[in-house]
Amino acid sequence: MQYKGMQMSCEQVVLSDQDRLARANGTVRLRRADGLRINADRLNWQTSGNDAYFEGEVQVKKGNMSLETPSLRFMGQQNQALYQKGGTLRQGSVRIVSDQGTGYLDDEVYSFEGRVTVAHPELDLKTHRCVYHARQDSLALQAPSRLVSLRGTFQGQAGHYLLKRKELFLHSRTEAAWAVMDSRYFVLADTLQVDQQQRSAKARGQALWTDSVRKISLHARSLQFDSAFRLGLTPMFPQNPLVRQGLHATGRVWLQDHSVQPPMDWMTESMQAWFPSSKDSLVVWTRDSSVCKVQEWLMRSNTLLADQARGFLQAEGRWMAWQGLSQMEASGLHWSDWRDTLSMLDFQGPTGISEMADSIPLPVYHQASGQKAKAELRNRTLYRMELQGNTVTLTWNRGSDSLWAALNRTEAARAVFDFENQTLARARYYGGPRGTYQPYGKVKDPQSLLEGVRPQPDLKRALEQSLLDRKGSYPDRGLVQLLQGLPAWDF
């Protein structure tokens, strides 16, 4: 039987001219000149609208597309197929199983709803609604979706996946999109873009990256993960940059590095990093003003480079640090072997140190400055500090009435200070030391004495509060649950 370019064969057919309806049974085959083939057990064909209803082991084939379903409605004028009782579509290496589906055969676009499962040699996908564009070989995800590939597990509330290019884009509406890669890296963000072929990713909007093995967490508004070479990391290129994983974070960056002891908290506006190896900690640096907290140390600087694996830290641009009651300032700093019990601080440029006090007339006990300095630490606590070149020291002495009574001023070529329990214990002066003594009442303007190295407790408190505020601005978005195990998929 032929009608409007359609050819049908079957074992039995009933024609109704009044209803313009053809009912066919028994191995029904429908053929069209463009290559469309539909096989079924039964067919109701409304010839006026060229609509056909197939039932019983329906099989549709056109080119490399095939569909199997218990029942199918085919609308010939729109060249559209629809099923609502479950079906399986195959297109090349893609296999899609769903509760309902619609195929737009002219455009080779297929829409699926209900419980949708996509199988591919390189991925498995579960969702509640998606659209497959066969010509572009891409999936548009229109509902919460979970994708499992060789690289990891990914979930978002919407997005798309380019199968040939192996690129995934996920975004969130109410819950964060997330990824678990290589069973150790956890990424959460408002939007997540992953290139599995290049092994790179971008996360934007309340972004979080966590290495559960190294125990490192990085928060930012935007995160990018790629090889150190493609990121163009500066100021240093790692050896074999193509195979070294790199990170680039921008916007309200907060880093927690617990990979080695002591742990480090770091706050800045942009940061770059790379991994020397899969076992080593990050090498991180920034050219933005930053605040860093390591054990009892609180530091700020304009630039900062830290290598946790080697225990090395370098800071430049008005470096300031606090430990206990002591405050230090310099143009820059090299801190070597900070992970060891014994370590050294090498200060760059004019250096000052001051020590807070808890009484009047001034909230300062000791101030000193020199042209350069170095310090020795034991258990990461200030043990000895040496100032060199035009050293000036101011020391307030306590009187018998428990008030500050006098000011000692000492000038020398070199001064060495010994500390105990994070407070000054002894001072030694070399190179023609000269000293003066003034009662407090004769000091004209004590507030201006060594202004550049006066303690700034308000700044310290403000920096500590900014660290707390930065931490509070990044609430948990599901990381705790992911670390305990992937949540069950709700179908």
Model-found features: residue ranges?
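Mature-chain termini and adjacent capping regions
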Residues: 1-491
